[in-house]
Amino acid sequence: QVLVMKDGKALYDRCFGYHTDANSEKVKPTDIYDLASLSKTTGTLLAIMKLYDKGRFNLTDKVSDYLPFLRKTNKENLTIRELLLHQSGLPSGLLFYQEAIDGKSYKGSLFKQSKDALHTVRLGVRTWGNPRFRFNKGMTSKEKNGDYTLQVCDSLWLNRSFREEIRKKIAEAPLKDKSYRYSDVGFILLQMLAEELSGKPMDEYLWQEFYQPMGLEHTAYLPLRYFDKKEVVPSAVDRFLRKTTLQGFVHD
């Protein structure tokens, strides 16, 4: 899709190609794409700004005042301002999914800097993964039922207890100095903060406060809750963790 606008008017608006190949959906103007890290500003930040405007918190407040699992940890004194500025000392990211993988289910290491017979999936510039692993017993299900309520892709659901694993991993993560360091972890905490203060899941709060009132008819968190799957363009083929094409679910 190519759109060129000037002074509020569309000068050029054309669609080309297909979602995956010539046998799939043609690209349409209303198709929905994964915004990836842009969701920090088009989602999480919007929610935080709205709650700030409503007087629900001050920027100098400690995050632990609202998220008790951070109390009595090295993150007890982190402020909301530091999270927003990426100056909290938090790591850039954490591999939460490792907590769901059975460490005894695969040979060798899970990651390696170069490709070999075991590490066949490229995950980064110098990172290759071993996809021959199993998840911990009781952690995943192929369908939603009972305690398995956290959907990761079409046929993978996590036990809701995994939220506690995420909180634990964040609480135990080391802190570095407070120079600028882009951090996904900081914005995960901001999402938790927004949901705690609003009393609503992030997708519902954003839909009600922003996307619906603004007439953004094809924008949403968790798009498959609001749109038909065929309206969403596939974003990645995950050969490592979920072993499927991702459509309507985040790729990282």
What are these regions (language model features)?
Residues G8, I32-T60, F187-E195:
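Active-site SXXK
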Residues Q1-L35, R56-N58, E164-E172:
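Short, conserved catalytic-motif segment at the N-terminal edge
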Residues L59-T73, P213-M214:
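Short, glycine/proline-biased beta-turn/loop segments that scaffold the active-site neighborhood
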Residues T20, D31, K62-F69, E99-I101, ...:
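Short linear capping/connector segments at secondary-structure termini
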Residues K75-D252:
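Short, surface-exposed loop or secondary-structure junction motifs
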Residues A47-Y52, L67, L84-P91:
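Generic hydrophobic/packing signal
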Residues K26-V27, T73-N77:
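Extracellular/periplasmic catalytic domains that process cell-envelope and extracellular macromolecules
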